[in-house]
Amino acid sequence: MVHLASIVSDLGFWPTVAGTVATYLFYQIVATVYDVYFGPMSNIPGPKLWAASHIPYILMLWNGEDASTKLALHEKYGPVVRVSPTELSYREAQAWKDIYGHQTRGKKSFPKDSRFYAPAVNGAPSILNADDPTHTRHRRILAHAFSDKALKEQEPLLKKWSDMLVSKLKENVEKSPSTPLDLVSWFNFTTFDIMADLTFAEPLYMLEGSTYSPWVRTIFGSLKLGSRLRAVRILPGMTTFINMIMPNSMRQKQVEHFKYSADRVDKRLANKNLDRPDLWAQVLKRVDVDGMSMSVAEMHSNSAIFMLAGTETTATLLSGLTYHLLQNPATMSKLVNEVRSTFPTRDDINVETLQRLPYLNACLEEGMRMYPPVATGLPRLTPKGGAAICGTWIPEDVAVSVSQWSTYQCEENFHKAKLFIPERWMGEDEQFANDNHAAFQPFSTGPRNCIGRNLAYHEARLLLCEVLWNFDLTLDEKSEDWLNQPVFTVWEKDPLWVRLQVASR
């Protein structure tokens, strides 16, 4: 009798389970159909499959196809595209203001999407991922380290490293004149040594050794993995799941990597009276002034951010710009002539004069438009209650961003958008009179725009000028298709092989 009751009970259990699962699936299908065709974002253009499921978007990010796919989607669907059930991509100038700009008249700011901005290993906020009040405090303290006055004081340090770059390049050219050099690596060596000198008061000695340090190799190795983990975290509940299954060895590597920079900050802080114009010299002057403060843990978090955001991006700008100049000989010749005619000797090169070179600055802008160091969108979340973006109301908790690559390649924003033409930035050619410069924000905009913008410009001008003043460049055939690159938050760059010849005087 008991056995029979058990059988009956079992037969009743499984139909119940099947019915529950079927009901759940039916509900999900109905909810998805409603959301895609009748929900508050059903009027936003985009592929229906992407609006119904996160999977296509996650696969796009996983494969490094963010820039190319979003460009294709925008060209098909227009200025705003629904790229997942809970994410929108924009390419309009107004979207920069609505999403990232200063919010007035009681409007709420758009918080950063925590799935994209991972917390530091020590849990302390940095200027990149802090909430608004903490970000304001950090920025007020750090702003002095990136001011024009501070950058002027840092010029000898920048010149020291630009001199070493030229010296090392000449050394290689003299050793093997016909061998092409990978300028991606050389620009990385230089920008990392500069930022380490500014952040830790000691370089990484990559230029001196002409090779990547193990620490920097770890940084580059983590970019792809980090981008893919961010993609997976888009799925609800995956952040907790990833934390559960992450091997202890990987956690230990994260800790060791963070400790490397933290130890060097501690070493610099132990020498508070060190007389040099680095970042922490400026910060230490501001801490506890006017009630402002920054904990040592926060300094550790910020130093880790500086060592990526202030290095790889500048090297990317220089690499991409060099490639485009080499693919456009007339433009290269015009820029080289401006540089060499302005500075009769190398000693004449200085950051103040470089700021005033019109064609050099136009080339930098065009380089960032054609090859933005951060090609993806930087996602924010619509605030509680929702918000209007480009005149359309978007519900709360939707990830929104401006896709830089799509925006800069859009003919509605820039005439002949897919061509490298620095003259568009000089205001002299009528065919570019309607270019929408407000759509161009390579350093973002608003209260959380890139604090290192001035340093990046000074550094890029100086390093490019030094290379062009000292060398004649020719693109090696191995790098003809160099631009064909995946994106994992930043471009995954192949070597840029360039033949250098010391310029004759």
From Swiss-Prot:
Top-rank taxon, per record: Eukaryota
Membrane protein topology class: Single-pass membrane protein
SUPFAM superfamilies: Cytochrome P450
Cofactor(s) essential for the protein: heme
Annotated binding of heme, by residue: 450
Chief localisation class: membrane
InterPro entries referenced in this protein's UniProt entry, alphabetically: Cyt_P450, Cyt_P450_CS, Cyt_P450_E_grp-I, Cyt_P450_sf, Cytochrome_P450_monoxygenase
CDD domains recorded: CYP60B-like
EC numbers, comma separated: 1.-.-.-
GO molecular function, one term: monooxygenase activity
Keyword annotations of the record: Heme, Iron, Membrane, Metal-binding, Monooxygenase, Oxidoreductase, Transmembrane, Transmembrane helix
Cellular location(s): Membrane
Pathway: Secondary metabolite biosynthesis; terpenoid biosynthesis
Enzyme class: oxidoreductase
GO biological process: terpenoid biosynthetic process
Residues spanning the membrane: 12-34
GO cellular component: membrane
Family: Belongs to the cytochrome P450 family.
PANTHER family hit by this protein: CYTOCHROME P450, CYTOCHROME P450 MONOOXYGENASE ASQL-RELATED
Job of this protein: Cytochrome P450 monooxygenase; part of the gene cluster that mediates the biosynthesis of enfumafungin, a glycosylated fernene-type triterpenoid with potent antifungal activity, mediated by its interaction with beta-1,3-glucan synthase and the fungal cell wall. The pathway begins with the terpene cyclase-glycosyl transferase fusion protein that most likely uses 2,3-oxidosqualene as substrate and catalyzes glycosylation immediately after cyclization.
Protein name: Cytochrome P450 monooxygenase efuB
Gene: efuB
